[in-house]
Every structure is written in C-alpha cells, then in structure tokens.
Amino acid sequence: EIRVSLVGSEMCIRDRLDHDWIQKWMPTDGSVIFEDLTNSTGVLVVAGPKARDLMQKVSTDDFSNENFKWLTAKKVNVGYAPVNAMRVNFVGELGWELHHPIEYQNHIFDKLMDAGKDLGIKPFGIRAMNSLRLEKSYKLVGTELSIEYSPYESGLDRFIHPNKGNFIGLEALNKWREKGFDNKLVTLEVHNTKDADVLGNNPIYKDSKVVGRATGGEFGFRLDKSIALAMVKPDFANVGDKLQVDILGEMYEATVLDESPYDKENNLLRA
C-alpha cells in the first residue's frame, strides 16, 4: 500500500487545481483512492534548536538523530494524540511537522506550550514563516511554483529525470526546453531598504529595463538582510549580478545571491 499526503496552499485548495488535476489522471480501476482531508487534518510545526528536546518531553517515541533522520516520517504519539511526524519544515531549522486529526489539535498545542515553557517556546505565524522560508530560498506553491513557470525555471531541476521514461507533461516540457526558458528563479538581497520590503509582484530592472518580477519578499532577521525571490531573465540571473527593484515607487539596488543564503549546507536541519 502506498499512501501519499499532499499539503497544498490555500490558493490551490480554493481553486481546486491540485484536486482536479489528480482526479483527471487517476486510474479508473479503483487501485487509487483520492480523499480530501482538508477539514479533518491539522498541522503544527515545531522548529528551532530545542525542537528535539521539546518533542522528547511530549512523546514516548525516540526523536534522536540516529532514530529519526532528516527527510523521514514516522507515526508517533504526542500526549494522547496520534501524529504523523515528518522531519521537514518550511523555516530551515531543526524541526518536525506534526500532522494530526483535527480533533486533537488543541490537545497537541496545549501539550507543546506547557512542556516548552522552560525551553522558551513561542508561537509564530504565517508572516514569520514567510520571512524564514525566504532566507532558505524555499519556494511557495502559487508564487514561485505555479502553472505559469516550468519546473526548470522554478529551480526544480534535480527532481526532473527526462531520460527515465515517459511521464505526464514530458513531451510539452521537452518542447519548452528546445525553445528555451524565459525566466530563472533567483534569490536577491535588497540593499538599504527603509520602512518597506519587497512584498511580491515588484518589477525588477536592469539599467531601466524591466527584466523580471519579485514573487515575494520580507526582511530576514537571521541574516539581518532584506530578502526577495524573483523570476528574472536568465541573462541577469548569475550570482553577483546587480539589479534594481521597485518598492512603492522607489528604486533599490539588489544583488543576486547564491541559493539558500541561510545555512546553505542544511547543517541545522540535519542536526
């Protein structure tokens, strides 16, 4: 039995893009079952240098690095709640996503907050998570990952193996590759920002000519830099290239950075 969990953004769920696409290509012999669990499943994220200490306080399962490696998942308990714990997160720190039946959410949250008092636990929201994910160049469905861009443009090259056999979209993707791509996803440091950072859809310039647009941005407090992700023309996507970005009608200098400027080697995630 193969079980697949798909956690989509609000936009994709609302527009039913994932839902309709999966149903379109599902086999009709009953070998695959598709069920929307949006209203019955919740997710809480535990992340930070003391995440393992906290999880060991609320669960009888072993969260050691040897027993629970990065990019793996296990069924565990948190208090009285059954949880599908995944050692991944969207903030770039040691941590776990805790997927659970929604009726256990308050119990899990209270358990984590009570056990984490002496560890300095604090709740954080989606805007904080957005800032943290940008420091890692993590891509968001609906912005950096969308039907508007090819997976090559969005920096998903390592997940594409066109020589391993046919798959849905391969023919169209090969034609796209032959034609050439119009965009490349880059991470930018925006210099000398004042009271506003890139929010998204900001035009990107090179010598007064529009060469792309920002898909998102925030101030990165771990890096102490204003960070943005942007789709730009490939000729201007090299590390070190100097560009300009429009924020509320004012131009700011920006530099193309190497991907994942915070903890590039993922040492914290692997800790």
Question: Model-derived features: where do they sit?
Answer:
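Single conserved hydrophobic/aromatic residue that forms the stacking wall/gate
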Residues: 1-13
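A generic structural motif
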Residues: 8-10, 96-98, 225-232
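Short beta-strand segments
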Residues: 9, 47, 189
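Flexible loop/turn segments at secondary-structure boundaries
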Residues: 15-17, 93-94, 105-107, 133, ...
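Short, conserved charged micro-motifs
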Residues: 16-18, 52-55, 104-111, 196-199, ...
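Glycine-rich, acidic
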Residues: 26, 31-177, 181
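Glycine-rich, small/acidic residue-mixed loop/short-helix segments
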Residues: 149, 153-271
